[in-house]
Amino acid sequence: SVDLKRSMIFVVIAMLPAILFGIFNIGYQEDPTRSILDNFISGLIVVGPIIVISYSVGGLCEVIFAIIRKHEVNEGFLVTGMLIPLVMPPTIPLWMVAVATAFGVIIGKEIFGGTGFNIFNPALVARAFVFFAYPAQISGDLVWKVSKIDGLSTATPLLTASSKQGTEALDLLNGVYSWSDMFFGFIPGSIGETSTLACIIGGVFLL
Protein backbone atom coordinates (compact mmCIF):
# COMPACT_ATOMS: atom_id res chain seq x y z
CA SER A 1 0.00 0.00 0.00
CA VAL A 2 0.97 3.63 -0.36
CA ASP A 3 1.05 4.13 3.41
CA LEU A 4 3.40 1.17 3.94
CA LYS A 5 5.66 2.33 1.12
CA ARG A 6 5.80 5.85 2.55
CA SER A 7 6.53 4.55 6.05
CA MET A 8 9.35 2.31 4.86
CA ILE A 9 10.92 5.14 2.84
CA PHE A 10 10.77 7.44 5.88
CA VAL A 11 12.52 4.81 8.00
CA VAL A 12 15.27 4.38 5.40
CA ILE A 13 15.76 8.16 5.28
CA ALA A 14 15.98 8.21 9.09
CA MET A 15 18.79 5.66 8.94
CA LEU A 16 20.86 7.69 6.47
CA PRO A 17 22.66 9.82 9.12
CA ALA A 18 23.84 6.69 10.94
CA ILE A 19 24.92 4.85 7.80
CA LEU A 20 26.67 7.88 6.26
CA PHE A 21 28.55 8.68 9.44
CA GLY A 22 29.33 4.99 9.93
CA ILE A 23 30.93 4.90 6.48
CA PHE A 24 33.04 7.95 7.28
CA ASN A 25 33.99 6.68 10.74
CA ILE A 26 35.36 3.42 9.38
CA GLY A 27 37.81 5.39 7.26
CA TYR A 28 38.51 7.74 10.16
CA GLN A 29 39.36 4.86 12.49
CA GLU A 30 41.80 3.59 9.89
CA ASP A 31 43.58 6.93 9.44
CA PRO A 32 42.34 10.07 11.27
CA THR A 33 44.84 12.26 9.42
CA ARG A 34 43.14 11.85 6.04
CA SER A 35 40.59 14.23 4.57
CA ILE A 36 36.86 13.74 5.13
CA LEU A 37 36.39 12.67 1.51
CA ASP A 38 39.25 10.17 1.63
CA ASN A 39 37.92 8.66 4.85
CA PHE A 40 34.42 8.45 3.40
CA ILE A 41 35.67 6.73 0.25
CA SER A 42 37.74 4.31 2.33
CA GLY A 43 34.72 3.49 4.47
CA LEU A 44 32.46 3.13 1.45
CA ILE A 45 34.79 0.50 0.01
CA VAL A 46 34.20 -1.52 3.18
CA VAL A 47 30.50 -0.85 3.80
CA GLY A 48 29.31 -0.80 0.18
CA PRO A 49 29.70 -4.55 -0.40
CA ILE A 50 28.03 -5.32 2.95
CA ILE A 51 24.98 -3.25 1.95
CA VAL A 52 24.88 -4.83 -1.52
CA ILE A 53 25.02 -8.36 -0.07
CA SER A 54 22.38 -7.54 2.52
CA TYR A 55 19.95 -6.14 -0.04
CA SER A 56 20.68 -8.85 -2.62
CA VAL A 57 20.20 -11.81 -0.29
CA GLY A 58 17.32 -10.23 1.61
CA GLY A 59 15.60 -9.21 -1.62
CA LEU A 60 16.02 -12.72 -3.06
CA CYS A 61 14.44 -14.25 0.04
CA GLU A 62 11.54 -11.78 -0.20
CA VAL A 63 10.98 -12.61 -3.88
CA ILE A 64 11.02 -16.36 -3.25
CA PHE A 65 8.45 -16.11 -0.47
CA ALA A 66 6.34 -13.69 -2.53
CA ILE A 67 6.24 -16.23 -5.36
CA ILE A 68 5.34 -19.04 -2.95
CA ARG A 69 2.56 -16.99 -1.37
CA LYS A 70 1.53 -15.45 -4.70
CA HIS A 71 1.61 -11.83 -3.59
CA GLU A 72 3.67 -8.76 -4.40
CA VAL A 73 7.02 -8.05 -2.79
CA ASN A 74 6.44 -5.35 -0.18
CA GLU A 75 8.82 -2.57 0.80
CA GLY A 76 9.81 -4.05 4.14
CA PHE A 77 13.06 -5.39 2.72
CA LEU A 78 14.22 -1.79 2.13
CA VAL A 79 14.42 -1.28 5.89
CA THR A 80 15.79 -4.73 6.73
CA GLY A 81 18.46 -4.47 4.05
CA MET A 82 19.78 -1.27 5.62
CA LEU A 83 19.39 -2.27 9.27
CA ILE A 84 21.46 -5.44 8.97
CA PRO A 85 24.66 -3.63 7.85
CA LEU A 86 24.14 -1.06 10.63
CA VAL A 87 24.36 -3.71 13.36
CA MET A 88 27.37 -5.54 11.89
CA PRO A 89 31.08 -4.85 12.52
CA PRO A 90 32.93 -3.51 9.47
CA THR A 91 35.27 -6.48 9.23
CA ILE A 92 32.58 -9.16 9.07
CA PRO A 93 33.13 -11.52 6.10
CA LEU A 94 30.67 -11.00 3.25
CA TRP A 95 29.62 -14.65 3.20
CA MET A 96 28.68 -14.29 6.86
CA VAL A 97 26.56 -11.25 6.02
CA ALA A 98 24.76 -13.34 3.40
CA VAL A 99 24.08 -16.22 5.79
CA ALA A 100 22.98 -13.90 8.59
CA THR A 101 20.69 -11.94 6.26
CA ALA A 102 19.01 -15.09 4.97
CA PHE A 103 18.57 -16.37 8.53
CA GLY A 104 17.22 -13.04 9.78
CA VAL A 105 14.73 -12.59 6.94
CA ILE A 106 13.48 -16.19 6.89
CA ILE A 107 13.45 -17.00 10.61
CA GLY A 108 12.83 -13.48 11.87
CA LYS A 109 10.11 -12.45 9.43
CA GLU A 110 8.94 -14.76 6.66
CA ILE A 111 7.98 -17.75 8.80
CA PHE A 112 5.58 -15.44 10.65
CA GLY A 113 3.93 -14.27 7.45
CA GLY A 114 6.12 -11.41 6.29
CA THR A 115 6.20 -7.68 7.00
CA GLY A 116 3.72 -6.64 9.66
CA PHE A 117 3.29 -10.13 11.09
CA ASN A 118 6.78 -10.79 12.43
CA ILE A 119 7.30 -10.62 16.19
CA PHE A 120 11.06 -10.15 15.97
CA ASN A 121 13.20 -7.57 14.20
CA PRO A 122 14.92 -9.45 11.32
CA ALA A 123 18.09 -7.36 11.67
CA LEU A 124 18.42 -8.21 15.36
CA VAL A 125 17.73 -11.86 14.58
CA ALA A 126 20.57 -11.70 12.04
CA ARG A 127 22.88 -10.12 14.61
CA ALA A 128 21.91 -12.69 17.25
CA PHE A 129 22.62 -15.46 14.75
CA VAL A 130 26.13 -14.16 14.09
CA PHE A 131 26.69 -13.62 17.82
CA PHE A 132 25.95 -17.24 18.69
CA ALA A 133 27.12 -18.97 15.50
CA TYR A 134 30.32 -16.98 14.94
CA PRO A 135 31.11 -15.29 18.29
CA ALA A 136 34.72 -14.48 17.38
CA GLN A 137 33.47 -12.07 14.71
CA ILE A 138 31.11 -10.05 16.85
CA SER A 139 31.84 -10.51 20.55
CA GLY A 140 34.61 -10.81 23.09
CA ASP A 141 36.80 -8.21 24.74
CA LEU A 142 37.73 -6.52 21.48
CA VAL A 143 35.79 -5.12 18.56
CA TRP A 144 37.65 -5.32 15.28
CA LYS A 145 38.11 -2.28 13.10
CA VAL A 146 39.54 -1.83 9.65
CA SER A 147 43.21 -0.94 9.89
CA LYS A 148 46.35 -0.81 7.83
CA ILE A 149 47.88 -3.00 10.55
CA ASP A 150 46.56 -6.56 10.30
CA GLY A 151 44.84 -7.68 13.45
CA LEU A 152 44.72 -4.27 15.09
CA SER A 153 41.74 -4.01 17.41
CA THR A 154 40.51 -1.80 20.20
CA ALA A 155 38.17 -2.11 23.14
CA THR A 156 34.75 -0.51 22.87
CA PRO A 157 33.78 2.22 25.34
CA LEU A 158 31.25 -0.04 27.08
CA LEU A 159 33.79 -2.81 27.57
CA THR A 160 36.36 -0.31 28.76
CA ALA A 161 33.98 1.04 31.39
CA SER A 162 32.70 -2.38 32.44
CA SER A 163 36.20 -3.48 33.42
CA LYS A 164 36.04 -1.10 36.39
CA GLN A 165 33.41 0.15 38.81
CA GLY A 166 32.08 3.52 39.98
CA THR A 167 34.16 6.63 39.44
CA GLU A 168 37.13 4.49 38.47
CA ALA A 169 35.19 3.36 35.41
CA LEU A 170 34.45 6.97 34.44
CA ASP A 171 38.07 7.99 34.93
CA LEU A 172 39.24 5.09 32.78
CA LEU A 173 36.68 5.91 30.11
CA ASN A 174 37.72 9.56 30.05
CA GLY A 175 41.31 8.46 29.55
CA VAL A 176 40.43 6.45 26.43
CA TYR A 177 37.65 8.43 24.75
CA SER A 178 36.35 11.94 25.22
CA TRP A 179 32.64 12.48 25.78
CA SER A 180 32.46 14.42 22.52
CA ASP A 181 34.04 11.50 20.64
CA MET A 182 31.43 9.15 22.06
CA PHE A 183 28.57 11.56 21.31
CA PHE A 184 29.60 12.37 17.76
CA GLY A 185 30.76 8.81 17.10
CA PHE A 186 34.53 8.92 16.63
CA ILE A 187 34.92 5.53 18.29
CA PRO A 188 35.20 1.96 17.01
CA GLY A 189 32.17 -0.29 16.89
CA SER A 190 29.51 -1.68 14.59
CA ILE A 191 28.82 0.36 11.47
CA GLY A 192 25.75 2.23 12.68
CA GLU A 193 26.10 2.18 16.46
CA THR A 194 28.86 4.68 17.20
CA SER A 195 27.22 8.08 16.67
CA THR A 196 24.67 9.13 19.27
CA LEU A 197 24.05 12.33 17.32
CA ALA A 198 23.25 10.48 14.10
CA CYS A 199 20.80 8.22 15.93
CA ILE A 200 19.12 11.24 17.53
CA ILE A 201 18.78 12.97 14.15
CA GLY A 202 17.16 9.88 12.69
CA GLY A 203 14.84 9.54 15.67
CA VAL A 204 13.77 13.18 15.51
CA PHE A 205 13.03 12.81 11.79
CA LEU A 206 10.68 9.91 12.51
CA LEU A 207 8.81 12.00 15.08
Model-derived features: positions:
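N-terminal signal-anchor module of multipass membrane proteins
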Residues: S1-Y55, G59
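Short, amphipathic, aromatic/basic-enriched membrane-interface segments that mark the entry/exit
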Residues: V2-L4, I45-V46, V63-V73, P89-I92, ...
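Alpha-helical transmembrane segments in multi-pass membrane proteins
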Residues: F10-A18, P49-E62, F77-G81, P85, ...
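Structural signature of hydrophobic alpha-helical transmembrane segments
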Residues: F40-S56, T91-A100, I187-T196
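C-terminal ends of transmembrane helices
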Residues: G58-K70, I106-G116, I201-L207
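Membrane-interface helix-loop-helix junctions at boundaries between adjacent transmembrane segments
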Residues: E72-G151
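Hydrophobic alpha-helical bundle architecture
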Residues: L86-P89, S190, G202-L207
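Long hydrophobic alpha-helical segments that form multi-pass transmembrane helix bundles
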Residues: G116-I200
